[in-house]
C-alpha cells in the first residue's frame, strides 16, 4: 500500500482516500464541492488524526517514479524525491483503519507545502466537521519519537503527550499551526520516520514509523474525555521575540548540518 500511496498525485490520492474511508465505515465524508481542499470524516473517538496529501516535488507522472526499497533494512528512497513527507502520515492513518477497529476523526489536507489550502479551508468549521474534540494529532514530523507543539503553550498537554514516549522539539510550521489556534484545541505533530525531507535524498525508515504507529494506537486506545485547550504562547518583550527567532534559526542550522536540507516542521 505504501508504494501505491507514494506513486499517486495529490488529486489521485484525494479520490483514493475518499473510497478508502467509505470502505472502513466512514459514511459521513465532508469535502468542498468542486475543490480539492480537504477530506474530513467524523469517527467514534474524539481525537482528530491529520495528514497532508501534497509533497514538495513536482508531480508529473508519479506512477512512473523510481522507488527503491531495501526490505532487509526497512528503508525507502527515490531519486525522484520520495515524498514520504507526508505520505508516511497518510499511510499511518490508513494502516490504523486497516489493522484496528479504532475509528478516530480523520482530516486530510491539501497544499500544506505551498499555501496551506486545506488547513485554511477548515478554519471556523470545527463544530460542523467534528463537534467537540479532545485534541489533534498531526502525523507530519521528521525523524523518530519527536513531538512538536508550535505556538501552543499547554504544559499539561505536553506532559501528557510525552508520557507516550515522545520528546518535545521545536518546529516552524504544519497544518495544526493554523488549525489549533482557530479551533482553540491543543494539538501535536509526531515523527513518522522520514529524514532529509524536501530533498532528493529523502529516506523513510519503517522501524521509526512502526514505533510511532504503536504509540498512536495506544493514544487512541487511552480514554480521554477532557478537551485539551489551545493556550497561545505569549511574547511580552522584543527580547522574547528575538530569543524565539534565534532559537528557530539555530535549530535550522543544526538540522542543515545533520540533514543537508534542514527541516520544515
Predicted regions and their residues:
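Secondary-structure boundary elements
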Residues: 23, 95-105, 128-131, 214-228
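Short secondary-structure junctions
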Residues: 23-32, 67-70, 164-168
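Acidic/histidine-rich catalytic neighborhood of metal-dependent amide-processing enzymes
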Residues: 80-161, 168
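Active-site metal-coordination/substrate-binding segment of hydrolases
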Residues: 30-31, 41-103
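A non-catalytic alpha/beta surface segment that caps or lines the substrate-entry region
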Residues: 2-45
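Zn-dependent metallopeptidase/amidohydrolase metal-coordination segment
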Residues: 57, 167-212
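His/Asp/Glu-rich mid-to-C-terminal helical/loop segments that flank catalytic regions of hydrolases
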Residues: 196-265
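Short glycine/serine/threonine-rich phosphate/pyrophosphate-binding segments
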Residues: 59, 90, 116-117, 173-176
Amino acid at each position: 500500500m505504501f508504494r501505491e500511496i507514494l506513486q499517486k498525485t495529490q488529486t489521485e490520492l484525494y479520490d483514493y482516500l475518499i473510497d478508502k474511508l467509505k470502505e472502513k465505515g466512514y459514511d459521513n465524508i465532508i469535502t468542498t464541492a468542486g475543490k480539492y481542499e480537504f477530506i474530513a470524516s467524523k469517527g467514534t473517538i474524539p481525537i482528530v488524526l491529520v495528514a497532508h496529501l501534497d509533497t514538495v516535488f513536482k508531480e508529473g507522472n508519479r506512477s512512473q517514479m523510481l522507488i527503491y526499497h531495501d526490505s532487509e533494512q526497512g528503508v525507502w528512497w527515490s531519486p525522484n524525491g520520495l515524498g514520504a513527507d507526508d505520505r508516511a502520515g497518510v499511510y499511518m492513518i490508513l494502516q490504523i483503519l486497516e489493522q484496528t477497529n479504532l475509528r478516530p476523526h480523520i482530516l486530510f489536507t491539501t497544499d500544506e507545502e505551498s499555501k496551506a489550502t486545506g488547513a485554511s479551508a477548515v478554519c471556523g468549521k470545527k463544530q460542523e466537521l467534528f463537534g467537540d474534540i479532545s485534541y489533534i494529532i498531526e502525523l507530519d514530523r521528521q525523524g523518530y519519537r519527536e513531538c512538536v507543539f508550535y505556538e501552543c503553550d499547554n504544559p499539561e498537554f505536553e506532559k501528557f503527550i510525552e508520557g507516550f514516549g515522545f520528546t518535545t522539539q521545536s518546529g516552524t510550521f504544519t497544518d495544526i499551526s493554523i488549525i489549533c489556534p482557530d479551533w482553540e484545541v491543543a494539538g501535536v505533530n509526531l515523527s513518522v520516520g522520514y529524514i532529509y525531507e524536501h530533498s532528493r535524498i529523502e529516506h523513510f525508515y519503517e522501524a521509526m514509523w512502526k514505533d510511532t504507529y504503536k504509540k498512536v494506537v495506544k493514544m487512541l486506545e487511552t480514554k480521554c474525555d477532557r478537551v485539551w485547550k489551545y493556550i497561545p504562547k505569549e511574547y511580552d518583550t522584543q527580547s522574547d521575540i528575538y530569543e524565539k527567532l534565534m532559537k528557530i534559526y539555530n535549530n535550522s542550522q543544526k538540522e542543515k548540518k545533520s540533514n543537508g536540507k534542514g527541516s520544515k516542521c
